[in-house]
């Protein structure tokens, strides 16, 4: 998950995280808490990166092998898990599996055993939540419980490296199981413990990588007139972009540069400078406006300073845009949960958006109430919040989308 920590604080700054953070969450699925706590802590110890989630996948499959389900390999280390309730259509639930290249600084007894790698984005919790849900589905099958849909669970690698979701979309898994809709969730530190949040329409930003390269001419620092200063051109570019920032705010967008590389020695005009940054937007028009602004500024700098400027943009994720029709159908059922509707979208990006390009989908946040940001080396949470995640998935599976009814008591 790609995000801007300050933006997350701004969006949720009016929430008093201390008010519910000390509660212990209990619901009708509390009998699963020992299992999901063990799963989460075991998985937290063995974080792996990208598609290289071999230990993680083996652990999850070992748990699932004891349940009445079909495990099907997908791309690379990803896999699908099918619970057959004899229905024509299926509902899909997705979780991510990979960790981050972060050295853990918690003192938890279940801290990462893999040096330089940590589950700092809660994917261990997402998997534990899904395994708890799988236990519930297995129970329903043993009880021969009638449900409106089959359940397809997707365990996705490489969310952090942006490859996983797109690779799965390019398979035929959704057609093979006649999937009607897809749901997912993400642990969220900036809302109350156990609270579930979502919204119709745009929820999370489109993420675009931006790289700007400046090519000038080297010269001695004592004779700057003989060179063309790429570093000066880069500074001019950033200054002009930041002068344009009021437009970004009006358009609900961000353009932020966080990395600069230039020169090799202190006493020479730099012939080469590069800037790396990120852009967050919610629609194509705003995206095009910002890209055009960067290219216009680049043209001005080329003419005024004589440095060649190349602006390269490459998309990471499209925006997470929850299907408004699907959201309207499930919203009634969500009233039985600790649910709140987000006021506005967030600038964080998530590759769940790739699934929403091909299926109606809704994404949710599940509050940890800690206030510790994602991608932080102290990230942690209480596993009891996952009980509400299981309840959410159970409610969604039982919601009959054609009639908008749900068997809440079952």
Predicted regions located by residue number:
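Structural signature of FAD isoalloxazine-binding scaffolds in flavoprotein oxidoreductases
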Residues: 94-96, 129-130, 184, 272
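Short, Lys/Arg-enriched N-terminal segments with co-localized hydrophobic residues
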Residues: 1-12
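Divalent metal-coordination and catalytic microenvironments
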Residues: 43, 93, 123, 153, ...
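Non-cysteine beta-strand/loop elements that form the S-adenosyl-L-methionine
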Residues: 92-94, 103, 210, 363-368
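Metal-dependent amide/peptide-bond hydrolase catalytic core
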Residues: 13-18, 232-410
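Acidic/His- and Gly-rich active-site-bordering loop/insert found
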Residues: 14-119, 124, 128, 135-149
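Histidine/acidic-residue-rich, glycine-tolerant segments that coordinate divalent metal ions
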Residues: 100-102, 107-118, 124-125, 140-270, ...
